[in-house]
Curated annotation (Swiss-Prot):
Its EC number is 3.6.5.-. Pfam families: ATP_bind_1. Small GTPase that may be involved in genome maintenance. Has weak intrinsic GTPase activity but displays no ATPase activity. This is GPN-loop GTPase PAB0955. A motif (Gly-Pro-Asn (GPN)-loop) lies at residues 65-67. It is an enzyme of class 3 (hydrolase). Signal peptide: none annotated. GTP binds at residues 10-15, 165-168, 224. Keywords: GTP-binding, Hydrolase, Nucleotide-binding. It comes from the Archaea. The lineage of its organism: Archaea, Methanobacteriati, Methanobacteriota, Thermococci, Thermococcales. Homodimer. Interacts with DNA topoisomerase VI subunit B (top6B), DNA primase DnaG and RF-C. GO terms for molecular function: GTP binding; GTPase activity. CDD domains: GPN1. It comes from Pyrococcus abyssi (strain GE5 / Orsay).
Length: 248
């Protein structure tokens, strides 16, 4: 089974990858893949590490700025695309789980040919789109997260599950509020209708058609610190694999 973690910088993606892997290692054979050319340290031992071929730091010494170096690093990774793809496919055959950690600059993986082609060639990968509770301040934000998960699904051609990370930092009242907004579309739509702004109207219209365009997927509530939600993620990954990508 291949699980791909994507998320914005600071969402806790890499820490979650490592801790979920250690959780799985109690019962399964697990391999890790690091696709972040800019990361300094990892909380896991990768079987495949793109930094062995190229790093952002090395490219910046050539005169590139930080953003340009990230893009250039992925341009250079394309030279080794088939090699990395074949290595990952071998890992998938030799292990129960392959956990793929993507760049902290999420757009690098989503919009570069390397990420898209890789996902097109992997067998039934499950994408976990990780969000930080800090970005969820108003009803519009929940609408954004659900639709962005759909956009990732469309872009990568892989089932994408939205996940709220760092839930150990939330009170029970806050957790319940997040669940209400994520899981009760009627409630979210009603709240959005109260916002008279142009953004509120747009979010309301998008949310109103959510049941028509969004597949019925579950939202995960995770914590790398307490391992909350890990059993749910394990179950969902198993169901995804056994149904060949259909979680409906």
């Amino acid at each position: 089974m291949i699980v791909v973690f994507v998320g914005t910088a600071g969402s806790g993606k890499t820490t979650l990858t490592g801790e979920f892997g250690r959780y799985l290692e109690d019962n399964y054979k697990v391999a890790y893949v690091n696709l972040d050319t800019g990361v300094k340290e990892l909380p896991y031992e990768p079987s495949i590490d793109v930094r062995e071929f190229v790093t952002v730091e090395e490219i910046m010494r050539e005169g590139y700025g930080p953003n340009g170096a990230i893009v250039e690093s992925y341009d250079r990774l394309m030279e080794k695309f088939n090699e990395y793809l074949n290595k990952i496919l071998r890992l998938e055959k030799e292990n129960d789980y392959v956990l793929i950690d993507t760049p902290g600059q999420m757009e690098t993986f989503l919009f570069h040919e390397f990420g898209v082609r890789l996902m097109e060639n992997l067998p039934y990968p499950l994408v976990v789109y990780i969000s930080d509770p800090e970005i969820l301040k108003k009803p519009n934000d929940y609408c954004f997260v659900r639709f962005f998960a759909l956009l990732i699904d469309l872009r990568l051609g892989a089932t994408t599950i939205p996940a709220l990370n760092k839930v150990d930092l939330l009170s029970e009242e806050e957790k319940e509020r997040h669940r209400k907004y994520f899981e009760d579309i009627d409630y979210l739509t009603a709240r959005l209708k109260l916002d008279p702004s142009m953004q509120g109207l747009m979010a309301y219209k998008m949310c109103s058609m959510m049941t028509e365009v969004l597949p019925p997927v579950r939202v995960l509530y995770l914590s790398a610190k307490t391992r909350e939600g890990f059993e749910d993620l394990e179950t969902l990954a198993y169901e995804h694999y056994c149904t060949c990508g259909d979680l409906t």
